[in-house]
Amino acid sequence: MELMFAEWEDGERFSFEDSDRFEEDSLCSFISEAESLCQNWRGWRKQSAGPNSPTGGGGGGGSGGTRMRDGLVIPLVELSAKQVAFHIPFEVVEKVYPPVPEQLQLRIAFWSFPENEEDIRLYSCLANGSADEFQRGDQLFRMRAVKDPLQIGFHLSATVVPPQMVPPKGAYNVAVMFDRCRVTSCSCTCGAGAKWCTHVVALCLFRIHNASAVCLRAPVSESLSRLQRDQLQKFAQYLISELPQQILPTAQRLLDELLSSQSTAINTVCGAPDPTAGPSASDQSTWYLDESTLTDNIKKTLHKFCGPSPVVFSDVNSMYLSSTEPPAAAEWACLLRPLRGREPEGVWNLLSIVREMFKRRDSNAAPLLEILTDQCLTYEQITGWWYSVRTSASHSSASGHTGRSNGQSEVAAHACASMCDEMVTLWRLAVLDPALSPQRRRELCTQLRQWQLKVIENVKRGQHKKTLERLFPGFRPAVEACYFNWEEAYPLPGVTYSGTDRKLALCWARALPSRPGASRSGGLEESRDRPRPLPTEPAVRPKEPGTKRKGLGEGVPSSQRGPRRLSAEGGDKALHKMGPGGGKAKALGGAGSGSKGSAGGGSKRRLSSEDSSLEPDLAEMSLDDSSLALGAEASTFGGFPESPPPCPLHGGSRGPSTFLPEPPDTYEEDGGVYFSEGPEPPTASVGPPGLLPGDVCTQDDLPSTDESGNGLPKTKEAAPAVGEEDDDYQAYYLNAQDGAGGEEEKAEGGAGEEHDLFAGLKPLEQESRMEVLFACAEALHAHGYSSEASRLTVELAQDLLANPPDLKVEPPPAKGKKNKVSTSRQTWVATNTLSKAAFLLTVLSERPEHHNLAFRVGMFALELQRPPASTKALEVKLAYQESEVAALLKKIPLGPSEMSTMRCRAEELREGTLCDYRPVLPLMLASFIFDVLCAPGSRPPSRNWNSETPGDEELGFEAAVAALGMKTTVSEAEHPLLCEGTRREKGDLALALMITYKDDQAKLKKILDKLLDRESQTHKPQTLSSFYSSSRPTTASQRSPSKHGGPSAPGALQPLTSGSAGPAQPGSVAGAGPGPTEGFTEKNVPESSPHSPCEGLPSEAALTPRPEGKVPSRLALGSRGGYNGRGWGSPGRPKKKHTGMASIDSSAPETTSDSSPTLSRRPLRGGWAPTSWGRGQDSDSISSSSSDSLGSSSSSGSRRASASGGARAKTVEVGRYKGRRPESHAPHVPNQPSEAAAHFYFELAKTVLIKAGGNSSTSIFTHPSSSGGHQGPHRNLHLCAFEIGLYALGLHNFVSPNWLSRTYSSHVSWITGQAMEIGSAALTILVECWDGHLTPPEVASLADRASRARDSNMVRAAAELALSCLPHAHALNPNEIQRALVQCKEQDNLMLEKACMAVEEAAKGGGVYPEVLFEVAHQWFWLYEQTAGGSSTAREGATSCSASGIRAGGEAGRGMPEGRGGPGTEPVTVAAAAVTAAATVVPVISVGSSLYPGPGLGHGHSPGLHPYTALQPHLPCSPQYLTHPAHPAHPMPHMPRPAVFPVPSSAYPQGVHPAFLGAQYPYSVTPPSLAATAVSFPVPSMAPITVHPYHTEPGLPLPTSVACELWGQGTVSSVHPASTFPAIQGASLPALTTQPSPLVSGGFPPPEEETHSQPVNPHSLHHLHAAYRVGMLALEMLGRRAHNDHPNNFSRSPPYTDDVKWLLGLAAKLGVNYVHQFCVGAAKGVLSPFVLQEIVMETLQRLSPAHAHNHLRAPAFHQLVQRCQQAYMQYIHHRLIHLTPADYDDFVNAIRSARSAFCLTPMGMMQFNDILQNLKRSKQTKELWQRVSLEMATFSP
């Protein structure tokens, strides 16, 4: 249709600068290539009438003659001379009215020169390939280089003398001949290649603009006729003497012929030629077309297009490091590029010139189009591309990979197919020219058929499948249009060809001399330059080709010329007989379209659903080639008559009659935009048995009955008589016996094949009445009959609005394998409807009185509800068509009524009531509404400003934002390009919104909330709030909504608005998750209904696809959700993601419910974050079906996490996507994260950044502006770009299972670069939500970079960021951890405390280096030293606890959401700490396995970062003696803590280090069986130890007797809220009184240095304990290291020596119990015997040396000494293996040290002597033994 070229008047369409350039390779060597010199015919239309135009903007203006008479009455003679000059050859004038007065001759000659400089521009550009020559000629004209202009009759000559500064010097003689306002030939002496040179242009412009300055003379023959004989002789002799050299030979030859006695031609012909008198009456007046130059230029252009083009990368990054776009994005670009890009540009510009020539009724249109067509068909590459693209299964063969290698040729192939389709569209318009004679139409038909055969021939030489020939539409749309008669369809007096013209036209064609060897008719199109020729002008404008060209019809057998009804010549029988009811049924005879024995012409065409090949059951059938083959998806269609009556013409003998919907009018578009991607419609039919895989019938190939083939009358009024189909697309049925009559007419050679290829043509006149009228309207508009076209389009527009197309999708069959819904018919109807709407808009908007109707048509098109397209190419085309309609709508001025309509639509969008079924979202409509209501600056000035109201902008904004939040109902796996298109439209709308409101942060937040789908659980980083979905199990029979319909909802999903009861209960969408919110507000769903949609529904309701979820996800959570609504920008930090989140794999199709997380279930080392698993929430995973998926069942039972920590079972909904390949990379449920979505949002982020002003990296080398204005990007937009980029990274991680192990990502480097540029705001956002987006090393690196900034706020934010990654210390290297600790220390002590706690917490799962932990311990000690003086009031707020034991500190933002308590969760078991005595019965404290069942208390901080107030720090036990509790649950009501009783050291059960008490990692959970077992605490005999707190808690009994004075501050332990104690099982517990009585007496006196200690501030004491605790953890980590043969294992001073000794000092400072605990830890962690010995000796020194033997008997100390002795034995054996003489001294010293170690135990010396004996027997040399013996002899301990 005309849509592509609708914007001609603005000059926007055909300059290639405005079209999309995907690669700039065409510019690389533009000047140097010979092919590039053509410049692609740019500039053939003036872009805008500016001061450069001589006409100032009148488009050429009239001639000087008109100007002279401005304001005067123009005489009738002048007016008549002008009309005669335009329409009638001067020779005819002379013959009809002899003699013509000379003055009248001069006036006719004066008006015969063209008046419009645009014509000169066009033909100059055509000849030269660009407008450069025209511009130079215009320059010469302005410089007054045209001298001595002279017009003699119809001949204009002058001398052009370029000024001295113009390079070519000298004068040029220019001559131009013209006739009937057309330049018919031109010549110049400059010798330029093209005839339309600069000088010719200068002369023409001079004649147009300075007509009065041209000397005007009568034709030479007129002047000669007035001379006497003497004057004639003088004239001849003077002429010869003036130019003797040039003229004399010719003059002598003419004299010889004249004087010859024989009958020479010059003597026998009457009269003589006169070049100045104009052409003869037999000559056709056509503009001079420089064909040879034009043909050469077209060849060069096509050659360059077909050849390989270089791909130029501007930098290495773009080639190697940038991520390749995913297939969906690549395919979208590949398919959109030919629609928008227009390549090759030169050919498209020529095609646009052809279209403009049609409009001007320039008879060169057809010759130019013919040259183009011939040249294109000579390139087999072009025909091969065209053929392959149009016959490929989905009409989109785009491989869609990177667009570099294969993608490049794909783009070229699609561009080529688009170009060829546009050519066919133009040929269709050429044959539909209302003024075309039937004879000429038949000639064109023959030529078109030959071209079709030529394409097929070229293809056969290639490697294409022969079986697809009939699928290839090629020229058939144009051939079908040849069978059309204006006289019958839509006669227009004075416009359409009438019988009075016919006789002249035929005589004319016979009279034309033909050029030998011409293969092409030059005058394919008769001239139609008069506005309305009258039937009574016989000699006026000859209609047939001129003398230079030969008719197309020569040598073609008449049988191939098509049906004869087009001609009135005798002997041609009409082949169309009237069927019942007036329907014409075309017998397949004429036009060679019959097929012997065929079931209606065996034309085949593949119809495919998107990218699907033929259905398998069709492929199993077989059928001979001539039988009727039906569409692949025929059986899935619904709504056709079950058994149509047999047609009288067809006996109905061959099985069931087949009936077909009307073909789409793919070729009726007037603009190249709407050429059909694959003009084949789907055939809906009950196919005959058997079908070859390739033989799918295309509908427009089938010789079918008229639109009224079912017996429908052709007129619209009679249409209701048949009720089989209620839309325009009627059913056709064919039979096998139609082709019998056609065989006799077959012509020889090749005719059979042609007959085969053209079998099934459907003549245009057999279409429905409205289709025929559309074709008429397009032809009228294309050929310049705008008033007639306008009248017709009004009628068509009203009909379209009154009878909208039916786009409902039929439900799939209830049974059988093929339950895939076919949307082929609906897709074709939709694309044709949009084509028609665009055409109607174009025509109607030309007249102000039709603007309202145009507006209604445009809105109708934008509101069209269609299903997803059946092929990828059509999906892209439909989206492009919508955008074109929107662009056309924006040009229409809107009045009050239109504005009220816009407000109404905006309201509906905002409220979500616009549509009830939307796989395709109305985003174009929303964009248009936004433009109209919110962005008045984008509207044309013609808009009615008075129609605005104050609330318009807010309404438009809310409607646009609501549209952004809509969600489609189709999955990316089934319709990837629809999802891609939806994303792109959303991105464009969001971009417009963000730019418009870039200074309004509240609006920007709303935009981003909808665009980034922050209410959806699937798309945001997995935080704890995601686990608390209240969805419950739904019926298992819920069907997947992947296609748009279900058995109970034929065609459309049932709307579930707040008012419609339907089968679902109110609130039934509560579990649907954050589905398409469509503007629904919270009031639509009662919050109190947490059940899911299908709960309690009847079974049929369960099968009904649910409507799009109309509630935001926070409502979907119901009242139990506890969802705190925190988005990315919220101040509180959401909790971290669970460990499995890192490996989300959204492509696993079977896990589609909330209860079946799509996670790869490999436990990551330590996970990335401590997840507070709470008490096993309902939906503990992110669902692949995501709770925002429409119609997918969010079936997650309220499973409870078991006591083992909520390890989740992989529950799969069986049979949900049966047979689907799990390795598919696109999600099978709507609105899921996908690779394509991630790519899109990254690109959007970069676009927003560019719109914000670009980042600094793009302007490194630009000079800073001196204006001092705003520097750098717009901050708000920059932040938006950052958030979008972060969101994209999150999506990317969702679909990249191994993202946590990445080492480099260009996306991450972009994010970090922007964060550095934005500053603290971006870092704050990252602190909130980096987990799920970045890996801990990436965050640590960014924090480190940011800490070096000058801005203190940024440094502070960098420290916060560093702190936030320390809980993942196991994923960081020591340098990163050290740097993060330094950053926190630089801020303040509180942050350092948090950092230390975070590292310790991370270390409990392993993976943190001991060196790091020692560093943390030193930091704690540094804090102790800072606060030892008691000045800790500043940190009171951070460490104080509320009465309930809940930490009220700064981590409140990290906790679980409030109110998550409840009685329904599993009890958490705490380790049993039963204390037993060996010989005496001691009361046992059993910390049992059941907890208080009271209501839980919500706590607002993360247990992971709580100060370590759990039991273990104060229990003097060895690191492994406490088991670790499962996930924290309820804090208990406060009660006195039980004391822990010391027992002898006989039992050493291997438990878990107490440090694990605070951990929440799922993998470190104690199973229930272990949790209930009793564990002993072996403690040396000493005073009772109570569980000590860090600070006082009111309301608790305080123990007054403590073992160490250091602890005497009267504080009670604040038990970690998650670590609750059970009731004490066992009644006789005297220790629970306020004055505990010692159970064991005879303890050691306290260490000397502690007996006199001063009272210490409890805060500093807390730091001291923490330092000790972390040091002990480091010791444990040392022991966990692999016991390999590393040299450091037995080193005298390994790296950790100083740290271990420092820790011993710390233990001694705390008390003897801590020293004993240290000894146990050291025995396990230290490997070096030398260090162990030093520890033993130093410990003995620190304890009182007087009681050394008592100490040595202590179990912990004894264990340490034994470990030291074992280490010496291992060391000696190790050294003996690798000993060399050089090492003897060292070895002897080691033996000496070992002896002193063995002396510490009674049995030690025996062991030592055994070692010596072994040494003596070893293979070492005697010398070594002698030295050892000597040393032992002199040894004195």
Curated annotation (Swiss-Prot):
Skewed-composition ranges (Basic and acidic residues): 523-532, 566-575, 1210-1226
Chain positions found as Phosphothreonine: T1139
GO cellular component, one term: Cul2-RING ubiquitin ligase complex
Modification Phosphoserine occurs at: S36, S48, S53, S437, S567, S1153, S1156, S1160, S1267, S1836
Compartments reported by the entry: Cytoplasm, Cytosol
InterPro entries per the UniProt record, alphabetical: Znf_SWIM, ZSWIM4-8_C
Stretches with biased composition (Polar residues): 1019-1040, 1144-1159
Positions annotated as zinc finger (SWIM-type): 172-208
Coiled coil, from the record: none
Keyword Phosphoprotein: yes
GO biological process: positive regulation of miRNA catabolic process; proteasome-mediated ubiquitin-dependent protein catabolic process; protein quality control for misfolded or incompletely synthesized proteins; protein ubiquitination; target-directed miRNA degradation
Ranges of biased composition (kind: Low complexity): 1174-1209
Pathway(s) the chain acts in: Protein modification; protein ubiquitination
Main location per the UniProt record: cytoplasm
MF-aspect GO terms: ubiquitin-like ligase-substrate adaptor activity; zinc ion binding
Biased composition (Gly residues): 55-65, 579-602, 1119-1130, 1447-1464
Summary of subunit composition and partner proteins: Component of the SCF-like E3 ubiquitin-protein ligase complex which contains CUL3, RBX1, ELOB, ELOC and ZSWIM8.
Function, as annotated: Substrate recognition component of a SCF-like E3 ubiquitin-protein ligase complex that promotes target-directed microRNA degradation (TDMD), a process that mediates degradation of microRNAs (miRNAs). The SCF-like E3 ubiquitin-protein ligase complex acts by catalyzing ubiquitination and subsequent degradation of AGO proteins (AGO1, AGO2, AGO3 and/or AGO4), thereby exposing miRNAs for degradation. Specifically recognizes and binds AGO proteins when they are engaged with a TDMD target.
Record-given protein name: Zinc finger SWIM domain-containing protein 8
Source organism (scientific name): Homo sapiens (Human)
Taxonomic lineage: Eukaryota, Metazoa, Chordata, Craniata, Vertebrata
